[in-house]
C-alpha cells in the first residue's frame, strides 16, 4: 500500500506542475501532425488516455499498455480535420502468448491538392501540387507482471510538400501500472524522441549568376538552397485513471493526463467514460486546461460495442470536439477486438 501512495503523490505533483505558466514554444518544431489526437474514444475523453489505453489507441498514447488487455485490437479512424484537411489513423495490436503484443500504426494528414500558379500564369499552369504528412510505427509491449507493463515503438516520419520531402526516425516508450485501489491505473509515456526534419528535393536546385556585372564566366551555376532543420515535437505524458463506479451493469471511469510538449506550454486533459452493460458508452472531457489562448476545449462522444459471438466484438465510436474559432471537429472510427 505504501508504494501505491508514492505513485499517487508523484502523479499529483506532476499534474500540479501543469498549472504553472510557461513560455510559449509554438512554431519551434516540425511534424506538428504528431500532436493530433488518435481515436474518437480517447479524444472524447479529452485526450486523457495514457492510463486508459486498453485498445489500439495505446500505440499513440502509451505503448506500455499494449499487452495489458490480453486481446488483439484494430481501429480505423477518419476525421475531417481543420481547413479542409483529412486526418486518418490506423492501429493494429496483435496479442502474442498473453503477455506479449506487437503492433503497427499508420498516421496520415492530407492537405489536399491545389493548382500551381505563377506570376505569369495566375490562373494555373495545368500542374497540381499537394502536401501530405505520414508516420509509420512498429511497436512491442510486454506484461512484466500482472500489474506492470512496458512497451516501445520505432517510427518513420515523413512530410511532403510538392517535390520536397523531410524524413526523420523516432521512438516512443511507455509504462502502465495497475493498483488495487478501485482499479486505479497509472501511465507514463515519452513519444517522438528522434532525429530532426530537413526539407530536400529538386526544387531546391537553382541556377544563379555569382557576379552579374562580370563577363566571360559561367552565368548558370547550379546551386542548392539549404533549408533549416526542425526537431520533432517531443511529448511527455503522465496520467491516472480510476473506476469510481463499478457495479454491473454500470461503470464510470475518470481519467486525467498531464502533458509536457516541447512545442507549447504544459496542459492537463481530463475526461470520463460511462458504460452500460459494456455495450453503450457515453464520454466527455476537456482538453488543454491551463493553456492560455487555446482553441481546444470541450469534447464529447458516444460508442457502441457489438458482439459477434465468442470473443469477437466490433466497436463504433463518434466524437465531437470544440475547436474555438475553427470548425468543430467530428471523428468516427470502426474497430474490432478478438
Regions found by a protein language model. Give the residues of each.
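N-terminal periplasmic accessory domains that precede
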Residues: 57-68
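Sec/Tat signal peptide C-region and signal peptidase I cleavage site
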Residues: 18-22
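Outer-membrane beta-barrel porins/channels
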Residues: 23-46, 87, 91-338
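Bacterial N-terminal signal peptides that target proteins for export
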Residues: 1-8
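Short strand-turn segments of transmembrane beta-barrel domains in outer membranes
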Residues: 47-50, 72-82, 319-321
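Bacterial N-terminal signal peptides
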Residues: 8-17
